[in-house]
């Protein structure tokens, strides 16, 4: 092996040269990985819109392996103009030579010849219709053998019609041609058969829709039309001497009673044959049979009708299973295998399917052995062809057409001793064909027809022709020669590499551990002209096939840059001798993994010379890729015994820190505490290199930390995995203890179990009776203690007055007093029921469902027609306060009368003094004083006879009644509790709740979301106590007790245990206002006497005290008239002279 002299390249050219090598490698390895040369296609074009290429066949004139043979391609053009006179679109058969020209095909004479010797073509007869007969819809050929068998060509026109009186019958016809494409005979298998019932007989036979020429000189024609499109096949002997051959036409049973398929099955849409069961059999596709399609296999027989051997079923409705058939020996066992296409098969990502039934000891299985599928809407399998042995492995290969994948694609699948490979060896796309297109239009519907298994360029490899009818084109792809190569590696230094010892034989001064191996190959001679080949080889370490993202070793390229992929070009002699090239690699510093071998891949590819102008001039060879690469590995020196194989036995024990456990069942009450998992890992055998422990957990469980002390180093690898390093290596007979803390607070409410998958691994080989893995299951219990209470604001309410407002119609519009629309304050006092939930924990309540049964109205039969007697009239939808949530109640129960807030706008009311505007239902004032003003009216009036006076009188009474209500300040209140204590009378109490059937109750549902421990939520229900209902129904009771009931629970789906029973009742007490009842003012006589006596004693005591303090002593001024001494007094003296003891009295 001679490496190219890179050292002679100038420095400024090295980069360019290396880039060229990489480009060559990439092109060779990825672009053209098989031997059909799509870069140099030979394209033949027909007339536009003629459907040229709808059918194709490779053909050899002369003996297949003879010296004077002529290779050509036969192309059907069903809408082309035939050479027969008086026809325009009857279809034609074309013969295309093996040249590079586009337009050198010649039409083969088919129609119009009346006898063998005449060259004159006659127009169609009066009893036939050739227009649109689709001559060339089917073209088949088989090679001429040395014994004289084969070499025939069949071309059909399935729409050919003949005329009987005024009726036209589309029975179809086929021409059998000789090896040199001369007319031999015409086949019309349906001619002369009954047509009285039109399509129910043979009126639309359509013979020639499919055809096959078998290797036993048998011709099989398919006709899907007989007997209401049941279909049939026709088998005829076409080989050998005419006088000696069997001229009987054998057919399948298509009668109403015995046909293997039902009407509209299209049996005969495709045909093939082979020795599937050790003897000759014929297969026919019925793509519409049973809806999913079937393939019926008939045995060869000398009796009519030929017997049915077996039936294969499709797997999907409407998939057209059996639309196309092919026979090939895909595993080289000399037993034919059956391939069935279902081009209309589909899934969300697939369009079209091909099923392989591999022959096993002369038996076809009823279930397919391999299924191939194509891209969506590609109609993968619309064409199938046995294309021969492309790679010389004695197994025939398969071509599958997908004409509607883009502009068309053909897939090449290689056979092997194990069967057909499921991965295509080559994908030929119309958009990637090389060469020049003469009309500038891209080729479309590429792959509508395929033919092969003929060596058209005489290089001993079969070639392929592909039709594209939408572009009126046929594409010939020639097969490139395959060079056989043997690849090997000499790798002595790759055994027991010591990462602690630097250098190697080829680089002893290196500071890194290095190694050297030799890449070798040998090429057998394949051509006398080529004695030497340029090969590109690459050595890749560890990153191929996605083994690793980074490699532990590297190479130096020509620019001394580190790389794990080394690429070079060498020259190799094609003399079968082995030639080698040395490759030196280096181990990276601080490499931890010394247990796993280092894997390498050596791969060779051919550096091609420039393409020739034509595939007919020269085809560049291609390496056999199955032998062009080899994988090998290098091992490290380890302390693992003489066999250099480390066998470790890791044992895991797991235990959580949960005291509440039963056997292997653990239960954790979810609160603020953490979960600790104690893990013991023991190694009972050889040292475990890169020993690691992994704990997989749910995303809602978070890793907190690892408790100390421990020899392991743990980290969170991602949100669901904790990775711990146990040592490198973990020595024999050692145990590592790890305690890991987890916080389960993030678990979803639906997660009721914590699952931990705990496992250990090592780069050493694991041995032992069981794998080092354990599963820990911890049941999660959420408990929440809900403290549920409720109360009413106010607890007591009062009602009085008349029941005139009880009418729903009056309330909704205008009350009878004519004061305008009713308001909330007009119907009754406001009542609030408060429901409070307190979560005492320990767990969060993700959702609390509260259901309130609300006494909406008194019970009444809905069919009675009575108006609704509201009880607690809902003002609005209840609300959730303090916490998140909402309540739901049917809309028809929330303020159905559309009452506005406040009171009606009565002019008399608005003109009254502010201190007198105390309406009976103004609860904000009356509740605080525990006082509700009476609604009873006091008025008097005389009766009026006329209606107008009566109306005016009513209005006056209303005004007086209203003013009396709002101005009267003195009220006679009734306290039932004190009354009972005083006189011991029995109370008349009414209880209204949802459990006794006396009320119509509304269901209010409230959802309270996400209540953490020690949080509170409150639901407020605002309503009005409907005054008129109580006045009309309970005017003389002691009190009315109205209950709303509520329950609170957490849905079971959240897995939270509620520790208390949460059912409560909230009561509103309604009292009648008894202002007209007489007070009991009688006082016992004893109390009167004691009162008088007590009063007299008190008076005497007060009098005595006053006497003591001199209250009764009076001091008067000096007055002579009082003493009886009268004397005359000077006028100078004052009229009143003060005495000695003068006291001034003011």
From Swiss-Prot:
One of its GO terms (biological process) is axonal defasciculation. The chain crosses the membrane at residues 1086-1106. It is a single-pass type I membrane protein. InterPro entries: FG-GAP, Int_alpha_beta-p, Integrin_alpha, Integrin_alpha_C_CS, Integrin_alpha_Ig-like_1, Integrin_alpha_Ig-like_2, Integrin_alpha_Ig-like_3, Integrin_alpha_N. Keywords: Cell adhesion, Cell membrane, Cleavage on pair of basic residues, Disulfide bond, Glycoprotein, Integrin, Membrane, Receptor, Repeat, Signal, Transmembrane, Transmembrane helix. Residues 31-1085 are extracellular. Residues 1107-1146 are cytoplasmic. Residues 942-952 have a biased composition (Basic and acidic residues). Glycans are attached at residues 68, 86, 147, 470, 511, 657, 680, 711, 718, 761, 928, 1027. Residues 1-30 form the signal peptide. FG-GAP repeats lie at residues 38-105, 121-186, 193-245, 254-303, 304-366, 367-422, 432-494. GO terms for cellular component: apical plasma membrane; basal plasma membrane; external side of plasma membrane; focal adhesion; integrin complex; lateral plasma membrane; plasma membrane. It comes from the Eukaryota. Residues 938-958 are annotated as: Disordered. SMART domains: Int_alpha (SM00191). GO terms for molecular function: cell adhesion molecule binding; extracellular matrix binding; integrin binding; protein heterodimerization activity. It is found in: Apical cell membrane; Lateral cell membrane; Basal cell membrane. Expressed in follicle cells (at protein level). At syncytial blastoderm stage, expressed in the ectoderm but not in the mesodermal precursors. At embryonic stage 7, expressed in dorsal and ventrolateral ectoderm and in some yolk nuclei. At late stage 10, expression is homogeneous in the ectoderm and is particularly abundant in the anterior and posterior midgut primordia. At stage 11, strongly expressed in a metameric pattern in the ectoderm, in the proctodeum and in the posterior midgut primordium. The keyword Signal applies. Heterodimer of an alpha and a beta subunit. The alpha subunit is composed of a heavy and a light chain linked by a disulfide bond. Alpha-PS1 associates with beta-PS. Belongs to the integrin alpha chain family. Integrin alpha-PS1/beta-PS is a receptor for laminin. This is Integrin alpha-PS1. It comes from Drosophila melanogaster (Fruit fly).
